[in-house]
A protein has these predicted regions:
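Canonical positions in the second alpha-helix
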Residues: 30-31, 65-67, 102-103, 138-139
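Structural signature of tandem alpha-helical TPR/SEL1-like repeats
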Residues: 17-26, 54-63, 90-99, 126-137
Length: 145
């Protein structure tokens, strides 16, 4: 990234943080199209929640998946929830578990906890209380299940 690009990206992130979402989307879009995972993730959030514009499930999924496939842990977690809840994409517990596991492998404790709950409840995966206990323990909960 050039100095100008750094300044533009910083401005786009500042617009997002200031909740100027329509402007942020416009500024983040070129970076997302160039493969910037953080820009892709932020755009996904804007489209998924209809922030500053009409909600767009197709674009929310497109950008969340693009960022997740690049290894962006928060996007992997977000994509896991999309699949778990059937939001922006068809509900798919196996896919949810796969993306939560990828995020958990990068240290996302929330993904570990969600995965543990899935195994505890048999939600989208086969119920496995032993696996649920193991995951809860990894997430820092000693007395769960």
């Amino acid at each position: 990234m050039s100095f100008e690009d750094d300044v533009d990206f910083s401005s786009a992130m500042a617009a997002f943080e200031a909740k100027h979402f329509a402007r942020a989307a416009q500024m983040l879009s070129p970076f997302a199209q160039q493969g910037n995972a953080e820009a892709q993730h932020r755009l996904a959030i804007i489209y998924q929640n209809g922030l500053g514009m009409t909600r767009n499930d197709e674009l929310a999924y497109k950008w969340m998946r693009a960022a997740a496939e690049q290894g962006h842990a928060l996007a992997q977690h977000g994509l896991g929830f999309m699949y778990l809840e059937g939001e922006c994409v068809e509900k798919n517990g196996e896919e949810a578990a796969r993306w939560f596991q990828m995020a958990a492998d990068q240290g996302m404790a929330g993904s570990l906890t969600t995965l543990a709950m899935m195994y505890e409840q048999g939600n989208g995966v086969e119920q496995d209380l032993e696996e649920a206990r193991r995951l809860y323990k990894l997430a820092g909960f000693d007395d769960a299940v």
